[in-house]
């Protein structure tokens, strides 16, 4: 199987988000990369499901709370930007201050 670089990046996000969710289920607080992976994964999948950019920008702020992550992580993540594939093409989705 030959994957293009973009497909490899998406696959890496899926694996990282899966690992993060498993750690979260064990009661662990998420670190910076785990938090970004979960948010990114949910945005990509939301786009695939047909949600709008505006809807995803709002949805991205509801995925994780300060209680879900290690101390200092919310202050480290100012924006999460992801290129997602929508039914009408690829668009950039930006979520500002995603962990509240």
UniProtKB/Swiss-Prot annotation:
| Enzyme Commission no | 3.5.1.5
Question: Catalyses which reaction?
Answer: urea + 2 H2O + H(+) = hydrogencarbonate + 2 NH4(+)
Quote a single Gene Ontology cellular component term.
cytoplasm
Q: What is this protein called?
A: Urease subunit gamma
The GO annotation for biological process reads:
urea catabolic process
Tell whether Transport is among the UniProt keywords: no
Subunit info here reads: Heterotrimer of UreA (gamma), UreB (beta) and UreC (alpha) subunits. Three heterotrimers associate to form the active enzyme.
Classify the main location: cytoplasm
Q: Which residues form a coiled coil?
A: none
The family annotation for this protein states:
Belongs to the urease gamma subunit family.
Pathway field of the UniProt record reads: Nitrogen metabolism; urea degradation; CO(2) and NH(3) from urea (urease route): step 1/1
Q: Which GO terms describe its molecular function?
A: nickel cation binding; urease activity
Q: Keywords of this protein's UniProt record, alphabetized?
A: Cytoplasm, Hydrolase
Q: Which organism is it from?
A: Arthrobacter sp. (strain FB24)
């Amino acid at each position: 199987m030959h994957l293009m670089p973009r497909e490899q990046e998406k696959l890496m996000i899926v694996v990282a988000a899966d690992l993060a969710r498993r750690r979260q289920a064990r009661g662990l607080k998420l670190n910076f990369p785990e938090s970004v992976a979960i948010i990114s994964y949910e945005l990509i999948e939301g786009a695939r499901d047909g949600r709008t950019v505006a809807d995803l920008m709002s949805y991205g702020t509801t995925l994780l709370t300060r209680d879900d992550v290690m101390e200092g992580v919310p202050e480290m993540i100012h924006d999460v930007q992801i290129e997602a594939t929508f039914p009408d093409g690829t668009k950039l989705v930006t979520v500002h201050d995603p962990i509240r």
